[in-house]
Amino acid sequence: MKDFSVQHYTFRPLSNEIGMVSMLEKLAAMGYTGAELCCFGGFESLKMTAKELKGYMDDLGLQLVGNHFTREMFQGSHEQAFAYIAEAGGKYAIYNIWGSYNTPADVAEKAEYLNGLAAIAAKAGITLLYHNHAAEFVQMDGKLVIDRLDEVLDPTIGFEHDVFFARQQGCNVYEYLRKHDRRVKTVHLKQLSEDGENVDLPDGVIDMAEVIRSAPYATDYIVEQSSFPVSILNSLEKNADYLKQI
């Protein structure tokens, strides 16, 4: 595998320490070809303009996938935030909604919110993606919440499928990816151990090569990790080496 990205959430503690530019240099040296930002509420924490970010990433041969937002933490103008992504060379505004989905009406209300954002994203020239956690793989009146969302979300909205949370809830992630094939635009490669922990990519129960084969229409495959057996850098290097071999 030649092209793979990494989620900012994975390395944010380290980038906060050494600076984003130095972090991007390390990622490029390891073989990553892209990054997905995780500025939940906006881009002030980056301390650089969109043009500056694009320049740094271009110089390093890195592609900006987009940025991950949360409904609960975002403040300010979606128009400005989405314009930043577009100017920095990104393709996607990725959203998740924390918490549970309690009723079909709750699903419909949240879908309406996301559909409104999709229209704003389209005006900026980017695409809205929906990122799952565990709550979307719970049954609601005989149907998974994610399938209910699939029915009511605007067809322009893509899915960013996080295989860790889906598998944690008992979902066959390969079948899911094939079922929603063209809607799955990006995949979070986050590994699950037999005892339910987040581990390095080579060391868990999810067959990442099969994940990639099951999502042929995805534009980006993105490493995400929140627990590190040795260190962030060690896991980043180990994961990159693993992906180069599959």
Regions found by a protein language model. Name each.
Residues 36, 66, 94, 129, ...:
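Conserved beta-strand positions in the central sheet of alpha/beta enzyme cores
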Residues 1-30, 84-89, 140-161, 166-246:
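Histidine-acidic metal/acid-base catalytic patches
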